[in-house]
Amino acid sequence: MLVAQKFACIKITGRASFNSSIDFKVLLNELLQKGFTTFVLDLSECSLMDSTFLGVLAGFGLKLTSANNGAQSVSIELLNLNPRITELLENLGVLHLFKLNQGTLKLPEGTETLPHNAANPTREEVTRACLDAHKTLMEINPENVPKFKEVTQFLAEDLKKLKSHD
């Protein structure tokens, strides 16, 4: 992750999936709480995103869109998306939440690399994150309800079972 002033660039490599979605969500929320206002996700090396990661990303995009109704402008840019991910975002009806860009990123002066620690979530936390992400996709675009209705029902049941074992 690269940071400077209120700018953060997060490089997503390989397959962006439910496994990395909690770390991603925690990181974005931490940066937002610290006052970062410009977010760039470098997707040049991201081969695929699953629906959970897409739901987390869309939820953050929605959160920033809502935050922009306030005084401070917050933006999220997706850099160098491959056509498959662009198509997924479009089909899920969430592409409008992001600014898209291709090419080389011009980094602000004073940019430095910042490490991020993994969250190591429990199975219950992963299940809850998956459920929340899919609910977000359905709330943003009602056309997603038939796509994810059964998934959310399964995840809700699984979450209930996990909680009852505590």
State the predicted function of each range:
Residues 109-162:
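Charged/polar low-complexity intrinsically disordered segments, enriched in acidic residues
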Residues 85-88, 107-111:
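Switch/connector loops and helix/strand junctions flanking conserved nucleotide-binding motifs
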Residues 99-106:
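Short acidic-hydrophobic, aromatic-tinged amphipathic segments that line or gate anion-handling sites
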Residues 3-4, 32-34:
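Flexible, charged surface loops at secondary-structure boundaries
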Residues 18-27, 33-98:
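Amphipathic alpha-helical interaction surfaces in cytosolic regulatory modules
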Residues 1-12, 23:
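Short beta-strand/loop segment at the start of cytosolic alpha/beta domains
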